[in-house]
Amino acid sequence: MTASLWQQCLNRLQDELPSAEFSMWIRPLQAELSDNTLTLYAPNRFVLDWVRDKYLIRVNGIINELCGVDGPTLRFDIGNRPHPVAVARAPARGADPVNNSQKSWESKAEAKPEPNHKSNTNVNYTFENFVEGKSNQLARAAARQVADNPGGAYNPLFLYGGTGLGKTHLLHAVGNAIKERKQDAKVIYMHSERFVQDMVKALQNNAIEEFKRYYRSVDALLIDDIQFFANKERSQEEFFHTFNALLEGNQQIILTSDRYPKEINGVEDRLKSRFGWGLTVAIEPPELETRVAILMRKADENQIHLPDEVAFFIAKRLRSNVRELEGALNRVIANANFTGRAINIDFVREALRDLLALQEKLVTIDNIQKTVAEYYKIKLADLLSKRRSRSVARPRQLAMALAKELTNHSLPEIGDAFGGRDHTTVLHACRKIEQLKEESHDIKEDYSNLIRTLSS
């Protein structure tokens, strides 16, 4: 009964939800039916709260459609189900890693002697010192789940986003967490170019079998910047077979890239297809609150008092990535140590003079308007006009929201730059875009793409 009912629920949800959303939140759930109560087990508190908040009504609706008024009561818990149950449909790729993945992963180390593996993970990168915000919340949750259950539902895990947003930090954090939980776990972190170099060396030394055995005997393979495989046909061929071997053995794969898998040029379609077999998650540029939190944490690590107003001053002006923020703060701290001066806004303005000037030059309202018009293939004059058609109004609202986030102009100044509109119009546009980013994947993706374009 449990398998039949929950499998039908899974099938309905898989048909209704975007594949990434289904893989992220629904596929990891386990279920048990007892005393007319269907209990859904989530892997952690974060997933439980999210599913209960976002999907409770729909799951109850499906149960009522299938069972009528006498259907089971739905409840949630954290942990593993007491008995086996159905799992979601998955793309055909051998054994489904959702079932028995933990058991096979735990026992594989004892199965046969393996090569000596050096992990290369940086112990300074952990989940504890990763600053979480709306921009990276899903990526961190997915990475945490992989660390707790390697080889499970999120395999492979593919993280993508611009430079300096925390992808590498999460790779190391997963590797460190796996090794902390199981000290003899064979975890390898590497840049994709290292894989290429190792393969070339193996070919030169007639040691390709040793190369294969080394990479196919790991518990977790963490590869950074997979886009560097582009146009390296022999490396792609070998990685294709390594990828398949690891997934068949329920061994975890995590990949990062600066772009969505299908947008990676020079990589074979069969590889790009496999990159999306598990879960693909974007990491966005950090929002203001996260940027401030990053600066405050970095200052604490350096035992430096950073006034709130100074943190906000820096965060409002440097928006592109975490690396840029940390570099700016390091410069401020160094200048303060050299001069003995107190850290305040005037001092920061002086210490970061060239950086702030460059940022203000790069992102202007005029530049935002031209970029948005080009992105949506509309005339700039229409963007600034009084036209209210959806094809023009929505890009205009996006441009206003971007101007508020990426520049230091006031709402009246932004409104004036958009054909003399009132500041309340700008405020409405910003609120509308925030709402649409929560409701529409397309709007969220467009906004993120424009942020990346304007911040690069």
Swiss-Prot record:
Basic and acidic residues bias: start-end ranges: 105-117
InterPro entries, alphabetized: AAA+_ATPase, Chromosome_initiator_DnaA, Chromosome_initiator_DnaA-like, Chromosome_initiator_DnaA_CS, DnaA_C, DnaA_dom, DnaA_N_dom, DnaA_N_sf
Keywords noted in UniProt: ATP-binding, Cytoplasm, DNA replication, DNA-binding, Lipid-binding, Nucleotide-binding
Region entry Domain II, spans: 83-119
PROSITE patterns: DNAA
Residues noted as binding ATP in the record, renumbered to the chain: G164, G166, K167, T168
Entry's localization field: Cytoplasm
Residue numbers spanned by region Domain IV, binds dsDNA: 337-456
Region of interest: Disordered: 92-122
Region (Domain III, AAA+ region), start-end ranges: 120-336
Annotated region (Domain I, interacts with DnaA modulators), positions in chain: 1-83
Primary subcellular site in the record, as a coarse category: cytoplasm
Alphabetical GO biological process terms: DNA replication initiation; regulation of DNA replication
SMART domains with a match to the protein in the record: AAA, Bac_DnaA_C
UniProt GO MF annotations: ATP binding; ATP hydrolysis activity; DNA replication origin binding; lipid binding
GO annotation, cellular component aspect: cytoplasm; plasma membrane
Domain of life where this protein originates: Bacteria
Subunit structure: Oligomerizes as a right-handed, spiral filament on DNA at oriC.
Family: Belongs to the DnaA family.
Domain free text: Domain I is involved in oligomerization and binding regulators, domain II is flexibile and of varying length in different bacteria, domain III forms the AAA+ region, while domain IV binds dsDNA.
Task of the protein: Plays an essential role in the initiation and regulation of chromosomal replication. ATP-DnaA binds to the origin of replication (oriC) to initiate formation of the DNA replication initiation complex once per cell cycle. Binds the DnaA box (a 9 base pair repeat at the origin) and separates the double-stranded (ds)DNA. Forms a right-handed helical filament on oriC DNA; dsDNA binds to the exterior of the filament while single-stranded (ss)DNA is stabiized in the filament's interior.
Protein name stated in the entry: Chromosomal replication initiator protein DnaA
Lineage start: Bacteria, Pseudomonadati, Pseudomonadota, Gammaproteobacteria, Aeromonadales
Gene giving rise to this polypeptide: dnaA
